[in-house]
């Protein structure tokens, strides 16, 4: 997309204006707000992990929803830097290569909600872009299995394509229910959707250990 077309789209996007008005760092925040309204994701006192967090819109909203007496209830992880957010601990690392670093930073903590709005840089080839985001989804699911509490929730971005159903079935192994959701805040011309895993099965951690 040319810079002129991008600027025109941004200026005419109601969610961009709304994000600025409400103090959120990105329009993507409203996708999470919709999913929380639909599935009742967040509760006070929960711990949340936000993968691919920069610039921080999802972490902002999650911290607002769960902050109670638990200081720093949200852990945010991204390969890029992210400006500080109240009640959010930011870890700058590459989740593909630094999972043991994450384990050290989490101090054996388990999360009630794990979020992933990650997407690789688009190359313009839909099949390649789809395969790349599925790879990120699989890496995120590995983290979910390792660090999620029983009955926890996992939300991940996905692009429709060849491997979509296979990944959906993988999620069903670990969650009592898996739902597709396309927020109104998603652009109409985008193939992005979200998978929402509800009710993480504690026993599924044993399945993953055996497979490994």
Curated annotation (Swiss-Prot):
Active site: 157
Residues the entry annotates as binding S-adenosyl-L-methionine: 56, 58, 78, 94, 117
InterPro entries given in the database record: RNA_methyltr_RlmE (IPR050082), RNA_MeTrfase_FtsJ_dom (IPR002877), rRNA-MeTfrase_E (IPR015507), SAM-dependent_MTases_sf (IPR029063)
Localisation: Cytoplasm
Reactions the enzyme catalyzes: uridine(2552) in 23S rRNA + S-adenosyl-L-methionine = 2'-O-methyluridine(2552) in 23S rRNA + S-adenosyl-L-homocysteine + H(+)
Keyword vocabulary terms for this entry: Cytoplasm, Methyltransferase, rRNA processing, S-adenosyl-L-methionine, Transferase
GO molecular function, one term: rRNA (uridine-2'-O-)-methyltransferase activity
PANTHER family: RIBOSOMAL RNA METHYLTRANSFERASE, RRNA METHYLTRANSFERASE 2, MITOCHONDRIAL
GO cellular component: cytoplasm
EC number from the UniProt entry: 2.1.1.166
UniProt similarity note: Belongs to the class I-like SAM-binding methyltransferase superfamily. RNA methyltransferase RlmE family.
Pfam families found in the cross-reference section: FtsJ (PF01728)
Role this protein plays: Specifically methylates the uridine in position 2552 of 23S rRNA at the 2'-O position of the ribose in the fully assembled 50S ribosomal subunit.
Record's protein name: Ribosomal RNA large subunit methyltransferase E
Residues passing through the membrane, by range: none
